[in-house]
């Protein structure tokens, strides 16, 4: 669904149609963005009181102070920080930690991705705007000092790792808290043995059903969250009217002061539970690409925020009139629910917790995909669960890892106290990272004064540092979990990024010069067989070493050679007309081309049967529109994109489809994987034919005809299977990272053939040893 398509843009902003579409998007965002924050009333007060740091007294200072803290935290963090400020810092409509990092890196040239990625992006893809950032001390320091660039990358990766940790903890906390309502209807001995198995069964079902995709039941998410918000707000209004109509007085900041003055250290430590009221706030920014700023703002300010405030006020009103709780762990959501409607509310709560968990799981898949696109995570299998809904992906390896970790923490802790301590640290760390990166965006991208940026950093940073310190104190009571998880994922990301960088440097240093190709003649000194050979390379210029290694050991190759370079660039999306760059290597008679295919870090590289067709048609269009100098060729030694041409639209080719008889094993490698449970279509054989255009030059038509014949003969994918080893004399840490860490990840990750979704029968791997 194109939420920002031409139809919406064509209508006048502020008109009836515009408001109608924004309202529809706001309603849809409830099920995707706000499931997690909507489920927070299930466990916020319980987490604040369950630790034993504060006790509910007859004077109600504790519950009033907790309500005041919840209200002002909700007002300042999600409403003031995210809705009013952070949502404006979009990267071509996309949000999230990597969006902020990408904005900063493109503006000040401080990225640590290989140089070719920046060059491949091109100025025309820079969504940050054409205005140059003014020279400042901060910008100069970032561009000059490599250490600051590494710290910036580590900061972005830290936020990403904590989001992944949140993906482990949120399902456990939400589902366990929702199911805990059963304890009010059972004996103490019964619910002790019932809650954990039921929670684990729900979690297993949740993760086991991920490969089916959410598009079949996604239409239910928004109604469920909407029903849940209406339910908790109505219950809140009832409790306010029935138990304590004057509870609104606790919204005054004065009650925060009374709370902290009375409880002192205990009250400060209880802030780790209070901060859970803003869990899920980061999703407003991370999911910006699926909706619009106005729709997300509308949903939060008009429905989510009022409903949550009423829910927390209602719980506080009930608790303020009841002081006979056995301990703090019994102060929770369900005690304030009237007994007659407790079972229906329990059912809605479980559904709402599942929706909130689904949102964070899907978000984790998207983040892993972004990291993999930017060479910060090993290549993983990405399955597109929907052929129509953008961004609906499923990563099997990550899904099962999340399930195992989620079940482990649930069974290991067995209560919400330790789980919420762990979740709180993950949530507040992500917010701190966003605050730090956002202050740099204000200074470097928005060109505001340093006073404005520091004001934002100090105000919101001070609030979040207080909560961060309160959460970190609970390190031995569960907060060690997100730290451990983020450390493991951080090590994986850093090792993979470092190894990939060293591999690229090796390729650059060992590439073959263009003169070597020219000296061996058009036949390349080998037998040229029918078909197209795609040679995968990370280089944008020169001849990769795997090609010379291949022809030295196997002196035969295809009649048409294509050096294919697939790049994920530091912009969220690349338009289809800007995706292909095509050039020629050597004279025309060599029939060697270079194609660079560019994807944004948010682009979904679908398992599309059209990829090969688009590739061939782009080369054909390049041949047709070649320069008048027929013997010109791209300078392979150049470090720029000189010689490459944008192919906005490939040459239209006529197709004839027929049954594939299976006699040609190197035939069309068209392959599409949408869902492993769908029946694969019967393979087809596609015959390409040139359009009947009499204006095409005879020599050009001959080259095009040869390209079509080669495509019909089949297409093979040749890639290097490099074995990385540290050079003798390298440091101990480098040897461990390269010889063991990176090699282990490489052996257990997907090969580059998965980037273009070619079947194994069309792939040839060339082994090489790379000494770095």
UniProtKB/Swiss-Prot annotation:
Annotated source species: Oryza sativa subsp. japonica (Rice)
Protein name (Swiss-Prot/TrEMBL): Potassium transporter 24
Entries under Pfam families matching the protein: K_trans, K_trans_C
Highest taxon listed in the record's lineage: Eukaryota
Keyword Cell cycle in record: no
Gene field: HAK24
Recorded GO CC terms: membrane
Family (UniProt): Belongs to the HAK/KUP transporter (TC 2.A.72.3) family.
GO molecular function annotations of the record: potassium ion transmembrane transporter activity
Any single biological process term in GO: potassium ion transport
Main function: High-affinity potassium transporter.
Region listing for Disordered, in residue ranges: 656-684
Subcellular location: Membrane
PANTHER family reported in the protein's UniProt record: OSMOTIC STRESS POTASSIUM TRANSPORTER, POTASSIUM TRANSPORTER 24
Cytoplasmic domain ranges by topology: 1-23, 88-150, 214-216, 287-298, 366-392, 445-449, 499-772
Membrane topology (UniProt): Multi-pass membrane protein
InterPro entries in the cross-refs: K+_transporter, K_trans_C, K_trans_N
UniProt keyword annotations, A-Z: Ion transport, Membrane, Potassium, Potassium transport, Transmembrane, Transmembrane helix, Transport
Transmembrane segment boundaries: 24-44, 67-87, 151-171, 193-213, 217-237, 266-286, 299-319, 345-365, 393-413, 424-444, 450-470, 478-498
Chain ranges on the Extracellular side, renumbered to this chain: 45-66, 172-192, 238-265, 320-344, 414-423, 471-477
